[in-house]
């Protein structure tokens, strides 16, 4: 099977003046052109062996304006950039007796070139190249028959490498960076059934335990180990419990350790000490003295599908994380943070003029939360059997534990992915993504709008709604989940008061929101469908000392998708053949143009927190037509 895709996306510039903001000649969102082409080849070598190869190239050219050149021409200062990315991966998997094996390899090359105009007519240049490569081999299968069923094992050996080179030219000053990391690793897991009525062992359902461990040795850091255990207890066919614990070590990233220092001038920043928004100089880069992070994660979960209500699944999860020596970007400069890092802050006559924002280690962070809710969905109408995929009509798994093992808990309780699980999500939280998760390598949508690159919002939900099947009937689905943060605390260092992020302290762009409600649903019938999603998170408060507090208001956002898959409308394609192989999608993000309101103690919105700065894009409408040839 061969699949080739190509695309182009053009975005116009959004100026501050279009959002009634005071700075002339400065853009909120850059203008850009993005191009992408990718292809995939899947080949059956024999009855039990399959190979695949995928390649992708994308390029993005962008232009942003940084304000007027008040010391020179008086024209807007420009920043021109070009990024190019080439990625490739290959895999082969098959069977060796009763054991499944898989071998994968990957390579990526990311190049970036940036020209920035400065006051007085000077021009800076920054270019960088990052190469990532690696591979792994996995084998998994049944080791032996235990007293309650077969004992299964999975072993993965892997290697990953990274090379990063950059050069920064500022006048006669030239700064270069040359970073490298090689990381061999080994991962193993063992699943042991403990109870199973089918084997006449116990009469209280099926109970199993999965033990896992990992060791890796980054070339620029000390050896790291991880281990964990997961208990799965299927009490009945409709009721299951999960408990897992993971002890994990993680090294700071290469850039956190060794990125070249870079100063950025004229950055708008809210000073909690004075209650004013000021223009400052920030210093970013790496910190070679960062320590390894140690994480302790506990998860308890329950899933229940009431037999009296078909298609309904209820779930509740409890997550607790305690981490030591967490590597973080420099936090929001509240009075508490300034007292903990006085050497990182420069003031002249009490006025904030500069901050050293290079990464730091927090001594300890602890957080816990409960997430509960339901999934409800049913099929209706006449169903068509799934079309065959590959040789056997089903997607071939890549082997138990294939690939680099994730750092998440060693099991899932069946609920959709949770935001903020394990590591804490900072700040206000991101706007809900679209109807499907972005593809690998696609630009994720961050503050201010879509990420760079094509495909950042996913394909429109066809696969997610239909599970890869083509159906003549229909299906509807809805889920509602509520997350409640119980604790969220950070200890910056010994002798410094602990920060309670749920009660006035902050490390990110705002406080920590205690409540998060997520609604998701959709309807699909004979090629036509819609998806909707909504998210509400409660507000927060940041204690500002003598300047007063900042209040971050509640925020509710709604997204909706309408789509048509003409592959499932034979009568339409017979009359209009050019629609064969095409899909049409209308997307509206942030349907009601909701924006978080931030006010100080006097009810005034600080300049740095104007809605145009927090979310310059607002409502986003997109019409997309895709056609396969």
Q: Can you describe what each PLM-predicted range is?
A:
Residues 3-184, 197-199, 204, 249-289, ...:
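Surface-exposed, low-complexity loop segments enriched in small/polar and acidic residues
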């Amino acid at each position: 099977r061969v699949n080739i895709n190509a695309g182009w996306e053009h975005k116009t510039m959004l100026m501050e003046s279009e959002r009634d903001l005071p700075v002339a000649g400065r853009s909120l969102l850059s203008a850009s052109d993005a191009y992408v082409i990718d292809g995939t080849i899947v080949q059956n070598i024999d009855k039990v062996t399959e190979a695949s190869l995928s390649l992708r190239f994308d390029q993005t050219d962008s232009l942003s304006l940084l304000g007027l050149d008040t010391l020179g021409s008086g024209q807007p200062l420009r920043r021109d950039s070009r990024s190019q990315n080439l990625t490739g991966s290959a895999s082969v998997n098959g069977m060796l007796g009763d054991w499944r094996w898989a071998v994968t390899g990957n390579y990526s090359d990311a190049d970036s070139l940036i020209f920035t105009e400065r006051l007085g007519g000077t021009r800076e240049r920054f270019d960088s190249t990052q190469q990532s490569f690696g591979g792994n081999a996995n084998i998994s299968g049944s080791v032996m028959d235990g007293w309650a069923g077969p004992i299964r094992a999975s072993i993965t050996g892997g290697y990953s490498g990274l090379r990063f080179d950059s050069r920064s030219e500022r006048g006669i000053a030239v700064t270069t960076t040359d970073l490298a990391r090689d990381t061999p690793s080994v991962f193993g897991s063992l699943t042991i059934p403990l109870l199973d009525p089918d084997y006449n062992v116990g009469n209280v359902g099926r109970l199993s335990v999965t033990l896992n461990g990992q060791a890796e040795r980054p070339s620029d850091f000390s050896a790291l180990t991880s281990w964990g255990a997961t208990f799965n207890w299927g009490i009945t066919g409709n009721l299951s419990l999960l408990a897992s614990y993971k002890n994990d070590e993680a090294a700071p990233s290469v850039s956190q350790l060794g990125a070249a220092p870079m100063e950025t001038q004229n950055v708008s920043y809210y000073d909690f000490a004075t209650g004013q928004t000021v223009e400052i100089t920030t210093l970013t880069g790496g910190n070679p003295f960062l320590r390894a992070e140690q994480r302790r994660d506990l998860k308890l979960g329950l899933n229940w599908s009431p037999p009296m209500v078909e298609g309904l699944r209820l779930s509740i999860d409890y997550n607790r994380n305690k981490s030591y020596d967490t590597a973080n970007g420099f936090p929001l400069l509240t009075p508490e943070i300034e007292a903990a890092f006085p050497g990182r802050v420069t003031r002249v006559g009490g006025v904030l003029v500069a901050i050293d924002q290079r990464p730091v280690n927090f001594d300890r962070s602890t957080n816990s939360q409960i997430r509960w809710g339901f999934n409800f969905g049913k099929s209706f109408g006449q169903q068509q059997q799934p079309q065959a995929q590959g040789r056997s009509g089903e997607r071939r798994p890549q082997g138990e534990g294939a690939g680099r093992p994730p750092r998440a808990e060693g099991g899932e309780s069946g609920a959709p992915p949770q935001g903020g699980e394990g590591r804490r999500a900072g700040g206000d939280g991101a706007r809900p993504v679209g109807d499907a998760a972005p593809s690998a390598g696609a630009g994720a949508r961050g503050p201010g709008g879509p990420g760079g690159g094509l495909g950042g919002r996913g394909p429109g939900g066809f696969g997610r709604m239909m599970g890869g099947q083509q159906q003549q009937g229909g299906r509807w689905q809805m889920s509602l989940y509520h997350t409640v943060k119980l604790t969220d605390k950070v200890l910056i260092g010994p002798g410094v008061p602990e920060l309670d992020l749920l009660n006035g302290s902050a490390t990110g762009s705002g406080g920590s929101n205690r409540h998060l409600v997520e609604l998701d649903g959709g309807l699909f019938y004979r090629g036509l469908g819609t998806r909707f999603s909504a998210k509400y998170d409660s507000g927060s408060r940041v204690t500002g000392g003598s300047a007063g507090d900042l209040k971050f208001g509640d925020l509710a956002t709604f997204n909706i998708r309408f789509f048509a898959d003409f592959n499932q409308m034979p009568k339409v394609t017979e009359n209009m053949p050019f629609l064969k192989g095409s899909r049409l999608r209308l997307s509206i993000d942030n349907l009601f143009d909701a924006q978080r309101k931030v006010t100080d103690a006097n009810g005034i919105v600080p300049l740095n927190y104007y809605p145009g700065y927090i979310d310059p894009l607002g409502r986003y409408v997109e019409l997309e037509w895709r056609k396969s040839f």
